[in-house]
Amino acid sequence: MAARGSCVSRQRQVLFLFLLGGLCLAGSELGRYSVTEETERGSFVANLAKDLGLGVEALAAKRTRVVCDDNKQHLFLDSHTGDLLTNEKLDREKLCGPTEPCMLYFQILMDNPFQIYRAELRILDINDHSPIFQDKKMILKILENTAVGTTFRLERAQDSDGGRNGIQNYTISPNTFFHITVHNSDEGMIYPELVLDKALDWEGQPEFSLTLTALDGGSPPRSGTATIHILVLDINDNAPQFPQELYEIQAPENSPIGLVVIKVTGEDVDSGVNAEISYSFFDASEDIRATFQINPFSGEITLKALLDYEFIKSYKLNVQAVDGGGLSARCTVLVRVLDVNDNAPELIMSSLVNEVVENSPETVLAVFRINDRDSGENGKMVCHIQENLPFLLKPSVDNFYILMTEGALDRESRAEYNITITVSDLGTPRLTTQHTIRVQVSDINDNAPAFNQTSYTLFVRENNSPAMHIGTISATDSDAGSNAHITYSLLPTQDLQMTLTSLVSINADNGQLFAIKALDYEALQAFEFHVGATDRGSPELSSQALVRVVVLDDNDNAPFVLYPMQNASAPYTELLPRTAEPGYLVTKVVAVDRDSGQNAWLSFQLLKATEPGLFSVWAHNGEVRTTRLLSERDVPKHRLLLLVKDNGDPPRSASVTLQVLLVDGFSQPYLPLPEVAHNPTQGEEDVLTLYLVIALASVSSLFLLSVLLFVGVRLCRRARAASLGGCSVPEGHFPGHLVDVSGTGTLSQNYQYEVCLMGGSSGTSDFKFLKSIYPEVHAYSSQDNSDGNPTF
């Protein structure tokens, strides 16, 4: 399965190589530069603008950048001058160790088109380290019969500097028995040997203490010292012997700590103390001493630290065996570290763009390099991204890859992508590294605002408070940022008679509509206009929606009584014959209401009456009718207070006062006349006075002449009416005719009378009806239609 995945990935890489024909992926050598170590940050290395043959502006336009192989920012490019400068103090010993020359490899990356230039920077050494001996005190045991000219190899000193600044010579403190010679090792390093110049005598001088000095070649030179303690021993005939001078072994780099790598064994044919052998490392570096340890009694060499093939591939161990008499032998153990697939691939990002414009195809998002510190198959890698993404991964030179868009993106469909770059090696087992890049798709103004509805209907009740919120018009824009910031406005209306700005206003930010002033349903029931929504993109895009405002009726108008008409001087008067049957139509109250709906549904009610049980009002049509037969006891004048009420919430009402005069047939000569210009209080007092007079007269004559007086009064009234001629009528309004506005008639017939007004000293006035003129003749033929609705 892994092999199949590798095959597919390789096929994709081959495809990518064909796709790279449109890009300039140069891998040219730029040059070699040098800089001295430990120089301050910002030290000049080279002028890349000059070396590349480009101007400073061109370098900036191409987004030129510097990438080092170890993924550390040792260098940086000054965009203003085109100079390549150091980004930190460079320590040659830290970067390269003892290796000489010390080279730092880096690349120059440029876009538009994409190019790579390889370059090298040599770190020049300065003498900033002194030689150091790992063992500050060395002990040598030399037999007293050792021949003159015998050499003894000493441990060399360590110097982190290289070249001429490394160790160049060794010296020893002045003496007559020894001198120092210098020899070159196979690794190209020098080591000291102690040479015996004069025969030793244990009895004469059993020990020596000498100072060994290591000198480097710097200017001025640096030095390091160690003490050599020489013990002169009595004669030991045989030195230890190793079976072989060179041991070669292999150790996997994942070997555990404490593993016995090898056991070396020396032999000594002597006996006793002279045959007792101790083992130790000789002339071992700091890395060897930190990684291995040797058992001084058994010769077992064990791991002290983990091996790392990528750091050190082999170790050369010099093992020394010393017997009890001071004689020694040496052998070499060569430990070769075997590589295992213990390093996952590395992904080193050189440049990264986390945002891309949605309509920009083939935009470079990232440039990165992959690396695996393992070797062989363990170091071979394949790289790929997820399927079904609108992105391409194109390989370049030196394990560089380019991540770019495959085509134009659509932010409204998907505004963010998480691209996972997977790098796998071909080792066993396979190791994988993943790096996720989060890419934001930036917006362009390619979508106009869209209203939630094509049309809106808003309802507002009349008599609203000015600046009242009546509704919200909402639009959305699938773009982002300023491209989605919507501004609302009222569009000009085509109705020239309507000034829209005097009726409504709109909040430009949130689309809230407000009524400028109080609306009047009776003046304006509904109106329409368009609202525009415009974004702030470039160019601006807009859309519009229709808004219809419907004004709801409020019960703000009280009923208006058309009939009977009211005035400030006196209530309207109707005549009622005493012979009227129950249900007789006295009059009909006609009223209208400017409101609509249930606010204009009117009902009628009798609030007050002189005789409450005599009259009734039909609630739905306003007809005032009698409820019973009239009697002689009923007073001749009745005042009715009628209420006209609508069905609003709360209801409104109007009242009308109606005065009804009772007549004994329409030929009766005398009837009381309603007061003219009297206030209601005075009228009630007059009625009370009349009642008192009648009551007093009745009590006085109750026992004697009650029946005769009653008959006489009636005969007297009839005789007086027959003998009475014409009389003058005082000025003042009095209806000469009665008109039923509704067409049904307030009385069963229409009459016209000649009347005269007679004044009295009591302050009251009476009508005298003389005779009927034009009986049964209608006064207004135009109003003779029955059951017709009035027109106003």
From Swiss-Prot:
Major localisation: membrane
InterPro entries referenced in this protein's UniProt entry, alphabetically: Cadherin-like_dom, Cadherin-like_sf, Cadherin_C, Cadherin_CS, Cadherin_N, Protocadherin/Cadherin-CA
Membrane-topology descriptor: Single-pass membrane protein
Domain Cadherin, chain residue ranges per copy: 27-133, 134-242, 243-347, 348-451, 452-561, 568-676
Pfam families for the chain: Cadherin (PF00028), Cadherin_2 (PF08266), Cadherin_C_2 (PF16492)
Residues with glycosylation annotation: 169, 418, 452
Signal peptide region: 1-26
Claim: Electron transport is one of the keywords in the record: no
Compartments where found: Cell membrane
Annotated function: Potential calcium-dependent cell-adhesion protein.
Name of the molecule in the record: Protocadherin beta-18
Taxonomic lineage of the native organism: Eukaryota, Metazoa, Chordata, Craniata, Vertebrata
